[in-house]
C-alpha cells in the first residue's frame, strides 16, 4: 500500500513545493481538488511528474454547495458541471478516481428523494467515466444518507457499472459503525480510502491518527482480507506548530498503522 495525503495539508504554496514536501515527508501520493482550467491541470501534472509524486484521485469540489440531490435543477446542473471538471482533471493529471459526495439529506430533501434524484443525475455521466476508465467513487460522510454498509453497497450496485465504486473513509463511519465491518461488506467495491483519527467517546475528530478509538489492527486486517492494496490518503491536520511538523506526525503515524 502507498501513503497519500490531501493537497491542502502540505506545507508550501505552489504545487511543486507541496509535492516536493510530500516526497520529503515520506508520502507517495497527493490527492488534489477539482482544477477548473486545462492550463492549471497541466501545471499540476508537470509538478507531480517532476517531483515523483502520483496523483491518484480528485476530490470533487462542489458536491456540498451544489448537491446532485438538490430539488432545484439549476443547482444540480452546477454540481454536474463541476463533476465534469473533476473528470477532466483526472484525465489530465493521470488520476484514476474522482471522489464524490453523492447526495445530501436536509429538512427540505427527504432520504428517498435524495437517493432517486442523485442517481438519476449521476447515471447521465457514468458512460463518460466508463469510456475513460475512471472510477466515480462514493464517499461515506455525514450527509445523512448511506449510513450503513449494505445501504452504501446497494446504492453503488444500482448503477451496475464497474466504474462506480466506494471511496471509503475510515474515520467518517465511527459515529454510527465500525470501519472494519464496512470494509468487509464493501469489499472489492472500495477503490480508494481516506484515513483520519476519530474518538467515539467525544464524537469528534482527532488531530492525529492514533489517539482516538479506531481499532487500527482490526481495520488493517479487514483491508488485507478484502485485498485492498492501493493508496491510503490521510485527511487530517496532524499534530505540530507548523504544516511540516503536522505532516511529519501524520507520516510517522501511518508508518505505524501500515505495520499493524
Place the predicted regions along the sequence by residue.
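Generic structural signal for well-ordered alpha-helices
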Residues: 19, 41-45, 83-88, 119-126, ...
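Active-site acidic/histidine proton-transfer and metal-coordination neighborhood
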Residues: 50, 69-165, 175
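Acidic-and-aromatic substrate-binding clefts and catalytic sites of carbohydrate-active enzymes
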Residues: 8-15, 31-43, 67-68, 106-109, ...
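Acidic/histidine-rich catalytic cores of soluble enzymes
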Residues: 13, 23, 58, 123-213, ...
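Residue-level preference for long, well-ordered alpha-helices that form the structural scaffold
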Residues: 72-79, 111-114, 118, 182, ...
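N-terminal pre-domain/capping segments
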Residues: 1-91, 161, 188, 200, ...
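H/E-rich (His + Asp/Glu) clusters that bind or coordinate divalent metals
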Residues: 214-219, 226, 231-232
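Hydrophobic faces of well-ordered beta-strands that scaffold small-molecule active sites
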Residues: 2-7, 30-32, 55-60, 98-100, ...
Amino acid at each position: 500500500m502507498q501513503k497519500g495525503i490531501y493537497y491542502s495539508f502540505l506545507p508550501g504554496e505552489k504545487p511543486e513545493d507541496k509535492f516536493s514536501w510530500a516526497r520529503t515527508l515520506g508520502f507517495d501520493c497527493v490527492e488534489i481538488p477539482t482544477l477548473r482550467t486545462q492550463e492549471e491541470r497541466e501545471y499540476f501534472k508537470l509538478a507531480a511528474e517532476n517531483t515523483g509524486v502520483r496523483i491518484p484521485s480528485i476530490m470533487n469540489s462542489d458536491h456540498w454547495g451544489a448537491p446532485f440531490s438538490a430539488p432545484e435543477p439549476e443547482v444540480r446542473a452546477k454540481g454536474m458541471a463541476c463533476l465534469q471538471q473533476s473528470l477532466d482533471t483526472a484525465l489530465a493529471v493521470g488520476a484514476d478516481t474522482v471522489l464524490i459526495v453523492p447526495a445530501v439529506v436536509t429538512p427540505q430533501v427527504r432520504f428517498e428523494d435524495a437517493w432517486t434524484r442523485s442517481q438519476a443525475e449521476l447515471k447521465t455521466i457514468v458512460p463518460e467515466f466508463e469510456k475513460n476508465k475512471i472510477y466515480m467513487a462514493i464517499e461515506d460522510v455525514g450527509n445523512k444518507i448511506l449510513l450503513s454498509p449494505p445501504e452504501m453497497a446497494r446504492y453503488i450496485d444500482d448503477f451496475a457499472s464497474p466504474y462506480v465504486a466506494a471511496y471509503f473513509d475510515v474515520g467518517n463511519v465511527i459515529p454510527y459503525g465500525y470501519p472494519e465491518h464496512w470494509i468487509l461488506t464493501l469489499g472489492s467495491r472500495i477503490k480508494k480510502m481516506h484515513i483520519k483519527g476519530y474518538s467515539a467517546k467525544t464524537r469528534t475528530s482527532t488531530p492525529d491518527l492514533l489517539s482516538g478509538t479506531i481499532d487500527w489492527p482490526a481495520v488493517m486486517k479487514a483491508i488485507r482480507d478484502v485485498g485492498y492494496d492501493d493508496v491510503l490518503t490521510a485527511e487530517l491536520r496532524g499534530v505540530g506548530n507548523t504544516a511540516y511538523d503536522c505532516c511529519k506526525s501524520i507520516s510517522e503515524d501511518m508508518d505505524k498503522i501500515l505495520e499493524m
